[in-house]
Amino acid sequence: MEIPDNSDQLSSFEFGKAFPLMSGSFSRRTFFAGALVATPLARCLNAIIPEVIKESRTQAAFELRKQTALAQSKRPMASMTSNGDENSFPNRIACFAKGLPQNRFGEVEPAAYNALLAAIKSGKHADFERIPRSGGRKLNNPQAAYTFHLEGGDPHTFDIPPAPSITSEAAQPETSELYWQALCRDVPFLSYETSPIVRQAARNLGATPSSVFRGPTKGDLAGPYISQFLLKPVRYGAYTIDQRYSMPVPGTDFMTTLNEWSPIQSGIPPWREASYDLMPRYIRNGRDLAEYVHYDFPYQAFLGAALILINSGPRSILNCNQFRSGSNPYRYSTVEEGFVTFGQAEVTDWLGRVTTAALKAAYYQKWMVHRRLRPEALGGLIHQTKASIRKYPIHSSLLESEAVDAIFHRYSSYLLPQAYPEGCPLHPSYPAGHATIAGACSVVLKACFDSSMLLPSCVEPSADGLTLVVRSDYSPTVGDEIDKLAFNIAMGRDWAGIHYRSDSVAGLRLGEDVGISVLQDLACTYTEDFKGFSFKRFSGTEVHITPQGEVVQSGGPRHRA
């Protein structure tokens, strides 16, 4: 059965839909054209001009902030619609509860879960401190769901659709995919066409060996599985980072027995750790990709991509290299070059900015709306139902999955093998945080660099990951590789067994929405001859953000001034 591309079903707010044209005496042009410098010249010009400039500049800055805030305030609040699993099962077996007191079957104590709900409802720090814990691990920042953000839309105004219910047939393909990924973790991407287990997985999932476990974009489906931005060296100032990493040895899987799985659900740290290969390797298989997104800092991969592109020209400044965006006003300047604006300082700063904004929106959805259980917990429900230990309302198509039976054949249990000793982090599954960051950072990279440019060469790791092999038959564009990088980072967490595909797809689209909203505000701040940002979303939709913060999407009207 083919894994559905959920991206077309993920409705997102049309940016600026509710934003009226700015009216009144102030506009962006009057801010900087001198219309506000209307203070009477009652004193000597030399004495009054600095004061006039100071006053008008302050007023201009205030009006700009006020108008962008007013525009963003007209965004509707998110719908807060979940899949209903929390209310369907009074014992909360379909909800995230890791780290709370549980019995040996992984069923949360009702009082503990109710305390979590009470804290989420109140938003008070004291109520969060009253949530019972049973292990050494702490909940991951549920109070962040209430945090405000001063650029772009408020975190509570971004919407995503409900996740599939554990009782629905829609849960079967993406859960089966996770079981197949666990079985294929150690197969080199270079060997997919000839691997029996990959061919079996592809056939079962309705894919081909060359397309299985990939994202849906044109960039994802062409060329090597791993993006060039995760393979090529990164110039980090005066230091060059070689992208070979210490990787776990093959077959290093966790939580394949109830004795190991059960205490970890209660938040008890794992009693064993992964064993690592002494030889650094490039990312050559699913396990390596899962390891990369295990210890990365939030926007590491996208900062690396930016540095690769920034340092690919004749000079290491963004506007002087071949990959700078056509909208960069300094591209054709004979006098100025960008740095603070439209340069290296700006793009690297923006990646961090949109990351924080994206995480706030994701954590609002995770904690306040969906509270979706993690795949490792669903694996526990599947195992106990299949083994007749307990009976849970899992859809029959999932219980009869070929992938689940294949896992039992290898591990003698139906649990979902985890790549990380500790399993998932202690926050709910939907949407994926890594994916949300990836979506937001992709918007920044596409806005700042020319997506149509071809990268100078293409490489892929050898089967052992020790070297890079040149692919002379494939010339990727910058945009295609940004898309591939985003899905690599999102799917890396799926390879670990800690997220579902729908978590990743929803996160990527949510991140795009957040990133666009931030650029709407930032686009209004320039005095350069700037025509706006233009790029394509993952769906292929063309987006243009004007200098007035309007968003024009292909096939749609112009929104917000």
Predicted features along the sequence, with ranges:
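Hydrophobic alpha-helical bundle signature of multipass membrane enzymes
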Residues: 2, 10-20, 24, 28, ...
